[in-house]
A protein has these predicted regions:
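Ubiquitin-like/PB1-type beta-grasp interaction modules and other compact soluble beta-rich domains
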Residues: 1-62, 66-67, 71-84, 95, ...
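Auxiliary tRNA-acceptor-end handling modules of aminoacyl-tRNA synthetases
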Residues: 35-54, 77-188
Length: 188
């Protein structure tokens, strides 16, 4: 099998305004560009300006904030609140006040460094160990009810998140965003 990302070659040089491919439908199923595919698969590229592409963009931004939060506040638990227009509201579990400047600097540096969003498969025990260590109680409950032998996670640096939908293959595409304090939490 081959990785879709290798088929695209120069894709990482494209920017936000180039409407690059950001995911693919492989044999009828939406997949990340890092997904390994069978040799004879039917592939339809998904572009950034499509509905699915915009969803991947927003989900990648959310994961980037989660990554920045683990760098700035390794002992805090970031909670995803609700959507607010085109943005998302986040807060910390114990209502700690965020330092928006520190979070934004980490996010900007990750984009500047073009960190890769990797896909990683963890055994059930590895996944449970990670979510327990990070005090992700809801994710822990979910993994225990699914009872799978392995789970797919997205990774940026040391930050992991269960993979539900494709994310952008590269943070360099995150050109249009902002973060601000709102209601004691964070608006992304």
């Amino acid at each position: 099998s081959a990785r879709i990302v290798y088929l695209l070659g120069k894709q990482r040089k494209l920017g936000y305004h180039d409407n690059p491919p950001v995911a693919a439908v492989v044999n009828g199923e939406l997949k990340s560009l890092q997904t390994e595919i069978p040799e004879n698969a039917v592939i339809d590229l998904v572009y950034l300006n499509s509905k699915e592409g915009r969803t991947a963009y927003r989900k990648t931004l959310c994961f980037l904030l989660s990554y920045a939060s683990t760098v700035v506040y390794p002992d805090r638990t970031l909670l995803v609140g609700h959507s607010l227009g085109d943005g998302y509201y986040f807060s910390y579990k114990n209502k700690e006040k965020p330092d928006i400047d520190k979070l934004k600097k980490v996010m900007e540096k990750a984009i500047e460094d073009d960190l890769i969003v990797d896909i990683e498969t963890l055994s059930a025990s590895q996944a449970l160990t990670y979510v327990e260590k990070m005090k992700l109680k809801d994710t822990e409950k979910l993994l225990k009810t699914r009872n799978d032998g392995a789970y797919t996670f997205n990774r940026i640096g040391s930050a992991l998140s269960v993979s539900y939908e494709p994310l952008l293959p590269s943070l360099k595409l995150l050109e249009v965003w902002d973060i601000m304090e709102y209601g004691g939490g964070i608006l992304l």
